[in-house]
Amino acid sequence: MLIDKMHLKFFRNHTDFDIDFGPGINVIWGKNGVGKTSILEAVYILSIGKSFKTNRVNEIINNRSKSLSVDGFFYDSENDLRISFQQFLGKSKIFKINGVKEVSKNIIGRFPVVLLSPEEEKTTKGQPSDRRKFFDKLFSLLSKDYLIKLIKYNSILKNRNNLLRLNSGYDVILPWDVQLSRY
């Protein structure tokens, strides 16, 4: 799918902003601090379901508002698709596809985006855990099955590690090890 246009409302320094994308390569340019990176961040949110810059909603919502919205309009040879994102301070994210509410995991992969920025240098030069995190994101975009298994794996690993911290016995940890071995 390709992005056709996008509307930002109270997203960082954009209070009410429309952008149309052309076919092929698009260049976003302007002075420092006008919101070029915010446009990329909004596209990323519509693709991945979260910001690449922060986990704190109050950093994304414009200080003149208590909410934000991003609407992206996408197309391919067969479909037109509208992905919407809303966030209110202190509330859960709301995603919609063509007006129907969706959980964020159903957004991932609809419109694949891979981010490579100077901050992502750790992907190539950083710790193995950083590379793993990058490729987990990439493969999750390409395969919903991978994403589902990754979520289950991380949940099992978290439970197992909690038991290890509590010095639980071998017989308590073994079932979690067995489950981990399936992934």
Listing of model-derived features with the role each one plays in the protein:
Residues 1-45:
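Pre-Walker A-like glycine/lysine-rich segment at the N-terminus of P-loop NTPase domains
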Residues 23, 34, 38, 55, ...:
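Generic alpha-helix structural propensity
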Residues 23, 117, 138-139:
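Short, histidine-centered active-site or binding-site loop motifs used for metal coordination
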Residues 13-16, 20-21, 34, 44, ...:
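Phosphate-binding site recognition
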Residues 47-130, 142, 146:
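Nucleotide-state sensing region of NTPase/ATPase domains
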Residues 122-183:
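An accessory alpha-helical subdomain
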Residues 24, 42, 110-112, 134:
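ABC transporter nucleotide-binding domains
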